[in-house]
Curated annotation (Swiss-Prot):
GO terms for molecular function: structural constituent of ribosome. The gene is rpl-21. GO terms for biological process: translation. Signal peptide: none annotated. The lineage of its organism: Eukaryota, Metazoa, Ecdysozoa, Nematoda, Chromadorea. Keywords: Ribonucleoprotein, Ribosomal protein. This is Large ribosomal subunit protein eL21.
Amino acid sequence: MTNSKGLRRGTRYMFARDFRKHGVEHLSTYYTQYKRGDLVDIKTNGAFQKGMPFKAYHGRTGRIFNVTRGAVGIIVNKRVRGNILPKRINIRIEHIKPSKCRTDFLNRVKSNDEKRKAAKSAGQPVPALKRLPVAPRGAHTVTTQNNEPELLAPLRFEIVA
């Protein structure tokens, strides 16, 4: 058979519900409040056909620009040939969830502010707050007192017939 050109082509596993996650949607989905500027992850819920985003937006992160009674408007970057275009799409709230992509950054900002305040109140200079890669291990000496060096040599190859 030839490939169909349907909107939902190739979404058999993408839009499938998770194992043991079928049935009525939790109320927390509807009670979550979204505001303009919030970052959200688009995760299409196959149980709801209304307000479903196109498959190219599944798994993307976008910023909310409009909130209505039953849906939200989201700006998502989409690559079209060589360009990255900001696309504005309207999606129902069953298909989105708040993104956790900034939680690490916001926690780091909060901890840095606390470190700054503590240093200022103690009258000390502000410590280096930038993240650094893990440094190489420090130098150490290996003693041969109770640790005799072992001579390693390859085993001789023997043909077993």
